[in-house]
Amino acid sequence: MSFVNRIRDIVGLNESLDYDEEYETYDVAADSYNGYNDAAETSSRRRQRNHTPTASIEPVSTASNVIGLPGLSSSSEVVVMEPRSFEEMPQAIQALRERKTIVLNLTMMEPDQAQRAVDFVAGGTFAIDGHQERVGESIFLFTPSCVHVTTQGGEQYLNESPAQPVQTTTSFGRTATPTPAWGTDSRYAAQ
């Protein structure tokens, strides 16, 4: 045996030609020539081959089949977070994974860090099929998929635009309403 074949045997790449299967060999032709065809012995072989052991059935308790779901309890939990830095954001994702609702108050953070934090938590919320809503100035609500957010009127809140247009101040001191994303053509306005 060469060195390469030994390595293949060790690694398991060489397929062995020896099989561990057992075959029952019956020499039917030899039995017919010898006149040795005993029907009683043949039927006893068939009975032995067809005999299957019966399995004992034990009653299974239903309590052992119950699997607990972590984070899924009768009471829900709301976590209010007021982070001061982006490093606290993985805690919000972990809370969402535990099916907890997050109220994220970002007033204590710098605006660029707050935007980064909202993007990070929004991505995590999207990944678990959760919902996100802006509640107020720099305050956001992130919920897992098992929580549905409704407004006071009872209808489901689906990222609707505010009823009153947002007023912005131009560099000339005048107030102006921003142009809608769909333009001024009313055919493309949301109904």
From Swiss-Prot:
Keyword flag Cytoplasm: yes
Intracellular or extracellular location(s): Cytoplasm
One of the protein's GO biological processes: division septum assembly
Keyword Cell division: yes
Gene Ontology cellular component terms for the protein in this record: cytoplasm
Membership in a protein family: Belongs to the SepF family.
Protein's UniProt name: Cell division protein SepF
Organism this protein belongs to: Synechococcus elongatus (strain ATCC 33912 / PCC 7942 / FACHB-805) (Anacystis nidulans R2)
Gene that encodes the chain: sepF
